[in-house]
Amino acid sequence: MASQEIEQLASTLARLPGLGPRSARRAVLWLVKKRDTALPALLEALEGVQDRLVECDTCGNVDTQNPCGICADPRRDRKSICVVEDVADLWALDRARLFTGRYHVLGGKLSALDGVRPEDLNIANLLGRVEEGGIDEVVLAMNATLEGQTTSHYIAERLEEFPVRITQLAHGLPVGGELDYLDEGTLAQALRARRPVQ
């Protein structure tokens, strides 16, 4: 049986997304084994961001500076905005290094069941950014859920009054995916979005 402090650390780690009690205990044991190198580095990293984390006023990204590094980067294409549901989606897309524009984080998705309305999301700020001008394209990169598609449709309707191209991510078969393992919705979307062989 571990000490109360070690149990407290495991309990705290278990509250992180993706970590259950067993994974948290394994992480604690690893930290104990590597306490001379890993633990000080982890503490330093946590202390380094604890008081410096801010939400970007422009896009809603989380960073240690405001505006965030993406919004402040002069090499980014300022004429295109990719709209995502949350910061995790922004980070995933940016890791792929395929989109060179800037982002906009909604902070969620419309959901009648959860009582999330348009005014609960960061939509007004998006419309303000587009209204300022200089934006040629808005990419709607919502998840392929009913709520995500409802959110995309709502935003597309709100953007119709502006002279911008509105696009959305393609949905369908994942690379390496086998047809037998895919759900009917994914297969239907893949069939609807089929294109000529090149």
Curated annotation (Swiss-Prot):
Superkingdom as given in the UniProt entry: Bacteria
Gene3D superfamilies associated with the record: 3.40.1360.10, 6.10.250.240, RecR Domain 1 (1.10.8.420)
BP term (GO), one: DNA recombination
GO-annotated molecular function: DNA binding; zinc ion binding
Keywords, in A-Z order: DNA damage, DNA recombination, DNA repair, Metal-binding, Zinc, Zinc-finger
Zinc finger (C4-type): 56-71
Domain Toprim per the UniProt entry, residue ranges: 79-174
Regions annotated as coiled coil: none
Task of the protein: May play a role in DNA repair. It seems to be involved in an RecBC-independent recombinational process of DNA repair. It may act with RecF and RecO.
Family per similarity comment: Belongs to the RecR family.
HAMAP family to which the protein is assigned, alphabetical: RecR
Entry-linked PANTHER family: RECOMBINATION PROTEIN RECR (PTHR30446:SF0)
Protein known as: Recombination protein RecR
The organism of origin for this protein: Erythrobacter litoralis (strain HTCC2594)
